[in-house]
Amino acid sequence: MNKEKEFLLWFEQMERGDVAIVGGKSSSLGEMTSKTDVPVPYGFATTAYAYRYFIEKSGLKEKMQAILAELTDVENSALLRDVSARLREAIMAEEMPEDLKAAIAAAYEELGKKVGEAEPYVAVRSSATAEDLPDASFAGQQDTYLNVKGAENIIAKVKECYASCFTDRAVYYREKQGFDHIEVALSAVIQMMVFSKAAGVMFTVNVATGDDSNILIEAAFGLGEYVVQGTVTPDNYTVSKAENKIVDRCVNEQDVMLVRKEGGDCEELPVPEAERNVQTLTDEQILELAGYAKKIEAHYGCYMDM
């Protein structure tokens, strides 16, 4: 298999060296699926080749170059907004090539067979596909779509990921850094949706102090997006790497949470009164998560956030 000429790759076909093909998020998910026993919700990713194929076959390249030529002053906020919006609109207005749509639809159907669920709910996320450009140069704030169901909806969200390559922020960054907008590419991760009672993030180093003796866990009720976005104040748990025990905890009040809606998409709901000041994770769950964090850090050989 020539990975560089495939429209998509399954997680077990990817590894950390595939950043240029499927981006940072996708390659890390592939690495953990194929090289570790850490549980990872299953899925696949579209490739940089698929993105460039879409841009080329749709004739978007020339349209985008013409629009970008009008961006004569990147410090002109109104002009930047206008150009960026027109670039996104141009992408969304084009039909994805039939063979690419068919490949995504077939992979989604195969995903359903593999997990034993017809038309499963998935998350669709963008993944930057170049090692020398940070995520800020690619995707916008809205580059994650949760609780998506059905092939047509997934194809539409993949296109929205492509369009997120041209947020005002992303265009400004690339202009200031001298990067070619047409040379960027984006991968979209299509991953089984986890309907979590609680979710959050973990760090194997305290980024504020540099202390790497503990695992730091932040968790809140509902889906993890509210933790990442800072919408809620999560619980904080500190686990000693050496002793494998919880050495500190801070349980914070949580009034709202993000949860899935039946049929697709998500909604904000109030946290039940009885749970608002309750510890989000059990001690057993905290220690299990810390164990995974240590495994991932050992595998990569560097500090990790996840």
Walk through the language-model features, giving the residues of each.
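N-terminal beta-alpha lobe that positions the nucleotide/phosphoryl donor
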Residues: 1-189, 198, 273-306
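Short conserved micro-motifs at the rims of enzyme active sites and ligand-binding pockets
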Residues: 135-136, 201, 227-229
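Short, acidic, Ser/Thr-enriched surface-loop or helix-capping motifs
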Residues: 206-207, 227
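Conserved catalytic alpha/beta cores of large enzymes that bind or transform nucleotide phosphates
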Residues: 214-305
